[in-house]
Amino acid sequence: MLERIGGARRCFRLSQKPAHSNGTSPPTRTEPGLLTSTARTDPQVLGWLKRRLGRDRTARKLYGSIVTQARRPAFYAAWGVPDTPQGRFEMVVLHLALVVRRLTREGADGQRLARALNEHFIVDMDDTMREMTFGDLRVPREIKQVTAALLDRHKAYSEALAEPQASKLQEAITAQLHYLGDSGQFDMVGLADYMRRAASALDPVPGARLLDGNLDWPQPDGGTAS
């Protein structure tokens, strides 16, 4: 499945220079005309819609930050991750898993935002596949597999980060990246160390700042890149 994600060009293309800090993200799908005239004036409905739109905007902001960080050259040049659609996919999902892990600690609001962020990723993948002219019957099957891969990685990385042994995270990363090539080409120690530093950088971010879409990423080679 992942070997066939060759069209993740819009979000996963690795630029030769560091991406801009604001990142890029696809437009949100809108469904005009879904609300009846009564619903448009109902305070509860309007309140729900306002919260949903705000959450979607925040998810787009977070996703842009994730993609920007995942495109940093060090992952590919220094640590051996292939500079291919599949390699970039894995780096985006790795960072997505870190953010979702942190969001789920922020109660109901954080869990809803984590869900919106995952949905934003899936919509982006769906759009990308359709741009590749995948058939309408094929796209749902591919998206089902992408969703399963996403959830598997969320679980594997979260469980490994909870273990004190550094080897557990290295093993989890190896298990997810093995299909990209000979595991000997990857610097698993460097990747695992970065992932722990990234988790440590996200942990102290105040909940209000996080729920407003602000992330603090470490530089792959040290320092901090917001």
Predicted segment positions?
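Short intrinsically disordered, low-complexity coil segments enriched in acidic
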Residues: 1-6, 110
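Surface/interface-facing alpha-helical segments and adjacent flexible terminal/loop regions used
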Residues: 35-226
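Leucine-biased recognition of intrinsically disordered, low-complexity hydrophobic segments
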Residues: 2, 14, 34-35
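Residue-identity detector for glycine
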Residues: 6-7, 23, 33
